[in-house]
From Swiss-Prot:
Active-site residue numbers: 140
InterPro entries referenced in this protein's UniProt entry, alphabetically: Acyl_CoA_acyltransferase, Diverse_Substrate_AcTransf, GNAT_dom
GO BP, sorted A to Z: angiogenesis; polyamine biosynthetic process; putrescine catabolic process; spermidine acetylation
Record protein name field: Diamine acetyltransferase 1
Biological role stated in the UniProt entry: Enzyme which catalyzes the acetylation of polyamines. Substrate specificity: norspermidine = spermidine >> spermine > N(1)-acetylspermine. This highly regulated enzyme allows a fine attenuation of the intracellular concentration of polyamines. Also involved in the regulation of polyamine transport out of cells. Also acts on 1,3-diaminopropane and 1,5-diaminopentane.
Amino acids binding acetyl-CoA: 94-96, 102-107, 133-136, 140-143
Stored Pfam families: Acetyltransf_1 (PF00583)
């Protein structure tokens, strides 16, 4: 594929971003867990204080998907802070449609994310990858990523909303 553009997402891209989030969730066998709406994406990413940033990969008209979509990939990220090393870019979701893989789109998205991280003086980029997702693990490792689970023994935890509400109400 000769031409594609990686650009910051706009509010008008929210329906495509949600479509790709659902495709990623399906790829990860978790599609029933997507509760987000287009309205949520719009309010959370394009309001006065955005909770996330997003890059999209757009192809020209001659390379549209069979359904007529021009947005074929995305990366959703935000900034966080580590008290030991400072600013971090956290890559929350990263997906390129299967028919558009192998054309350098994913590599270009990662390059743009790296440029954003360097411009913002981030010390590193963090992200999660499912243990079974060898293609993605290899993609990241070829670009210098290290597996903190095996190298440093970190475990990821979460506290669901139900328990957050319970703790918030405690006296």
């Amino acid at each position: 594929m000769a031409k594609f553009v990686i650009r910051p997402a706009t509010a008008a891209d929210c329906s495509d971003i949600l479509r790709l989030i659902k495709e990623l969730a399906k790829y990860e066998y978790m599609e029933e867990q997507v509760m987000l709406t287009e309205k949520d994406l719009l309010e959370d990413g394009f309001g006065e204080h955005p909770f996330y940033h997003c890059l999209v990969a757009e192809v020209p008209k001659e390379h549209l998907t069979p359904e007529g979509h021009s947005i074929v990939g995305f990366a959703m990220y935000y900034f966080t802070y580590d008290p030991w090393i400072g600013k971090l870019l956290y890559l929350e979701d990263f997906f390129v449609m299967s028919d558009y893989r192998g054309f350098g789109i994913g590599s270009e998205i990662l390059k743009k994310l790296s440029q954003v991280a360097m411009k913002c003086r981030c010390s590193s980029m963090h992200f999660l990858v499912a243990e079974w997702n060898e293609p993605s693990i290899n993609f990241y490792k070829r670009r210098g990523a290290s597996d903190l689970s095996s190298e440093e023994g970190w475990r990821l935890f979460k506290i669901d909303k139900e328990y957050l509400l319970k703790m918030a109400a405690e006296e």
